[in-house]
A protein has these predicted regions:
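Helix-loop-helix connectors at the membrane interface of multi-pass transporters/channels
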Residues: 94-97, 124-144, 176, 240-244, ...
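Membrane-helix boundary/coupling elements in multi-pass transport proteins
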Residues: 111-124, 233-241, 298-335, 378-379
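A generic transmembrane alpha-helix motif of multi-pass inner-membrane proteins
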Residues: 187-188, 376, 381, 385, ...
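TM-loop-TM module centered on a large, flexible mid-protein loop between adjacent transmembrane helices
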Residues: 94-96, 133, 252-314, 333-381
Length: 472
């Protein structure tokens, strides 16, 4: 998820021009898109959400990430090919509309909006959990309320200078992970004193790699995929490339760098401590270095992630606000959400208000379910993202003239997505997340049916009648 740092801002800007022609010329080079993608894809889902995956499957989480990276590459590659063949600012929702009709574009757009609302809830909860590192007695909902209010205030103040701050904070996140990798390697080689416990050793037996069996490995896939969430937004940003045909190359390099960072850092973390030492309330990288004499690290690392994570959440709020304006502009949401208030820097307050209600829902959930809220929201957000990824793959079958090998690869990508989604049904502690995502899909589906029979068909009939009258 998570939709991420300056990507969310870019998403909003691209969304505002969703009807623009594909002939627009950008000035971004492919390697710049790769670097931006790395910085904005790394989010709180990785710094905290990966802990759930580790506790679910153990050291084999690194293999989960490799499979998720492969699935992500397949999705991005297909999206990049569609972008190169028919560049459109609307990106994946436009292609769903083109392939299957207006109901698909409508469903894709609202599903994406819903997934981002859940991702914001996940980010809000993650920030609150990380803050409890210093203030363990402060209730989760109180932290969530504070972060939500400040985030809304930042959006109300406007976007001036925000992108530059986003880039700096994306760099902070990446630097924090690089810092962990360097320190962890030093620890593995014995350059730091270990305060009790066994020295680091990589598991080399099946039951050590898969302590929860293949069932646990299957269940963990959703969290690995969730960490790669946001790749579809890079598809939107591909419109800014000077050469649109460079989109697949940019995505390949970006995913390669991300996979190396993820696998190396998590591989080091699971090597350094036992499975039982990880906690959902703490970053796995902080947990991994708990037994070493590094008093500064937890505070520096935690602080860096909270600052950057807050920026990511605020950017996501910018993004969902602009996305709803686009849905409204396309006739897929009430016209109310297009309205902008001049007194508030032309900000679409109705659209922001609906996003704020989503944050309020997360706060209420944190109050009612403080123990499991992060697992539930993260799981459901990850599943909703994968539903859109499935839309991307299915759309490619109708839009692209793929060779047989490309079709086989696309089917394999669908199977990986199916495995990740179905794996959430195997573990009762995260199963509610699946049903939450299903509830969203049912609501969106019913809304699409209503729009088809009560709005779109009616508008089509009126247009046909007007056309006939004109001919007469």
């Amino acid at each position: 998820m998570t939709t991420k740092a300056n990507c969310s801002s870019a998403k909003g800007k691209a969304a505002q021009n969703s009807k623009a022609s594909g002939e627009q010329q950008g000035d971004m080079k492919w390697w710049q898109l790769s670097l931006v993608g790395v910085g904005c894809t790394i989010g709180t889902g990785y710094f905290l959400g990966s802990t759930i995956g580790i506790k679910t499957t153990g050291p084999s989480i690194v293999f989960s990430f490799v499979l998720a990276a492969l699935g992500t590459y397949i999705v991005y590659n297909l999206l990049a090919k569609m972008t190169a063949a028919d560049p459109q600012e609307g990106s994946f929702c436009y292609y769903a509309n083109k392939a299957f009709g207006r109901w698909a574009g409508f469903s894709c757009g609202w599903n994406y909006w819903s997934s981002n609302i859940l991702i914001m809830g996940s980010q809000l909860t993650a920030l609150s959990l990380l803050s409890q590192f210093w203030f363990p007695k402060v209730p989760l909902w109180l932290f969530a309320s504070g972060f939500a209010i400040v985030s809304i205030v930042v959006v109300l103040l406007g976007t001036k200078g925000f992108d530059r701050v986003e880039n700096i904070l994306a760099l902070i996140k990446t630097a924090a992970i690089v810092m962990f990798i360097i320190i962890a390697i030093c620890a593995v080689f014995g350059w730091f004193g270990l305060d009790g416990g066994k020295p680091p050793s990589f598991p080399n037996k099946f039951n050590e790699l898969f302590p929860k069996g293949l069932k646990g490995f299957w269940t963990s896939l959703i969290y690995a995929f969730y960490v790669f969430g946001g790749i579809e937004v890079i598809g939107l940003m591909a419109m800014q490339l000077k050469k649109k045909e460079d989109a697949p190359k940019a995505g390949t390099i970006m995913l390669l760098v991300l996979t190396i960072i993820y696998v190396v850092s998590l591989g080091l973390a699971v090597t350094m401590i036992s499975l039982g030492a990880f906690s959902e309330k703490e970053s796995p990288f902080v947990s991994a270095l708990d037994s070493y004499h590094l008093a500064f690290f937890p505070h520096v690392f935690n602080g860096a992630i909270i600052i950057a994570g807050f920026s990511t959440m605020t950017a996501s709020l910018f993004g969902v606000t602009n996305l709803l304006v686009t849905l409204s502009d396309d006739g897929n949401a009430p016209a109310l959400f297009m309205q902008k208030i001049k007194k508030f820097k032309d900000l679409p307050l109705p659209s922001l208000g609906l996003g704020a209600l989503g944050l309020l829902g997360s706060i209420i959930t944190a109050l009612l379910l403080p123990g499991k809220i992060y697992e539930y929201i993260t799981t459901s957000a990850g599943i909703l993202l994968l539903y859109n990824w499935a839309f991307i793959i299915l759309s490619s079958f109708k839009i692209l003239e793929n060779k047989i090998w490309s079709k086989i690869t696309a089917v394999f990508g669908l199977l990986l997505i199916l495995a990740a989604v179905s794996g959430t049904l195997l573990e009762k502690e995260i199963r509610p997340g699946f049903f939450i995502s299903l509830l969203f899909i049912v609501i969106i589906g019913l809304a699409a049916v209503f729009m088809k029979f009560k709005v779109w068909n009616k508008n089509k009939a009126m247009a046909a009648k007007a056309s006939k009258s004109g001919l007469d």
